[in-house]
């Protein structure tokens, strides 16, 4: 234990003797001091190794074993240097001052692991930077893709809303146009029906005009005959007006002549005049004549009254007989007209033939069906 403590003290003294304070380079008159580059390199390597120790190793990689090897080398450096030692001499090594040699060896051994450590740290830092850059790029690309998808989704939503609004407007406009077209169609249909009705009416008027023209052409030669017929008809009417008071006398059969009838009616007329005079209806001159006639013949009034009664009874009987005779005559005339019509029909059918008569009595379709093919 005493030997190891003395050895450590010697090493520290040698290290203190070898250590040179770090001074900045400055210009001195007459000479120039150049610092040792070996010490500067050692310091830089130590700084780089310390920075590499602070950095964390990337995931999936094992921590470097350089510090452990360095410690082992330091331990081995402080141990025995002789490999052929006898038993018992390992505990009491020779008392040699190897501090300078150990310091050089340790500094060299420490420099090489630091270099390896810095290279590995640089490589790992480069790899980690590349991975971080790739991850950042991927994240950036993913974010850009998500932003683009969100913008496209928003645009699609806006387009769908616009399409729905435009579709609603188009539907409303189409409904209005359809209603207007329906109204226009109804108006045109009414106009077409009105024009068709007017056309049919004009066609009927034209047909009637053509028929009237044909009738006028056919009847124009008969106009003189019509004028002559009018004149003859007027003459017949005037003749009937002048002779109508004598017509019943020709149709009624009476016994005796007209003079005898007048002689029979003269007393009745006188009584009528007298009665009218009493009622102050007849003139006084006629009443005086009737009274004079009655004064000359005192029994004439009673005779006239009897005659009037008999005339009344006779007229009543004749009236009944005339009514009965008139009904019989009407019946006979109807039968005679029937017989005459049947005879004329038979004669006409014989003259015209069966086909023409069938057209008069039956419809044309029935005649076509019954006609021989």
Swiss-Prot record:
<feature type="modified residue" description="Phosphoserine">
    <location>
        <position position="99"/>
    </location>
</feature>
<feature type="region of interest" description="Disordered">
    <location>
        <begin position="1"/>
        <end position="76"/>
    </location>
</feature>
<feature type="compositionally biased region" description="Basic and acidic residues">
    <location>
        <begin position="52"/>
        <end position="73"/>
    </location>
</feature>
<keyword id="KW-0007">Acetylation</keyword>
<keyword id="KW-0493">Microtubule</keyword>
<dbReference type="GO" id="GO:0070652">
    <property type="term" value="C:HAUS complex"/>
</dbReference>
<dbReference type="GO" id="GO:0007098">
    <property type="term" value="P:centrosome cycle"/>
</dbReference>
<comment type="similarity">
    <text>Belongs to the HAUS8 family.</text>
</comment>
<protein>
    <recommendedName>
        <fullName>HAUS augmin-like complex subunit 8</fullName>
    </recommendedName>
</protein>
<feature type="coiled-coil region">
    <location>
        <begin position="130"/>
        <end position="204"/>
    </location>
</feature>
<feature type="modified residue" description="N-acetylalanine">
    <location>
        <position position="2"/>
    </location>
</feature>
<feature type="compositionally biased region" description="Basic and acidic residues">
    <location>
        <begin position="1"/>
        <end position="10"/>
    </location>
</feature>
<keyword id="KW-0132">Cell division</keyword>
<comment type="function">
    <text>Contributes to mitotic spindle assembly, maintenance of centrosome integrity and completion of cytokinesis as part of the HAUS augmin-like complex.</text>
</comment>
<feature type="compositionally biased region" description="Basic and acidic residues">
    <location>
        <begin position="32"/>
        <end position="43"/>
    </location>
</feature>
<dbReference type="GO" id="GO:0005737">
    <property type="term" value="C:cytoplasm"/>
</dbReference>
<dbReference type="GO" id="GO:0051225">
    <property type="term" value="P:spindle assembly"/>
</dbReference>
<keyword id="KW-0498">Mitosis</keyword>
<keyword id="KW-0175">Coiled coil</keyword>
<dbReference type="GO" id="GO:0005813">
    <property type="term" value="C:centrosome"/>
</dbReference>
<dbReference type="GO" id="GO:0000922">
    <property type="term" value="C:spindle pole"/>
</dbReference>
<keyword id="KW-0963">Cytoplasm</keyword>
<keyword id="KW-0206">Cytoskeleton</keyword>
<dbReference type="GO" id="GO:0051301">
    <property type="term" value="P:cell division"/>
</dbReference>
<dbReference type="GO" id="GO:1990498">
    <property type="term" value="C:mitotic spindle microtubule"/>
</dbReference>
<keyword id="KW-0597">Phosphoprotein</keyword>
<comment type="subunit">
    <text>Component of the HAUS augmin-like complex. The complex interacts with the gamma-tubulin ring complex and this interaction is required for spindle assembly. Associates with microtubules. The interaction with microtubules is strong during mitosis, while it is weak or absent during interphase. It is unclear whether this interaction is direct or indirect. Interacts with EML3 (phosphorylated at 'Thr-882') and TUBG1.</text>
</comment>
<keyword id="KW-0131">Cell cycle</keyword>
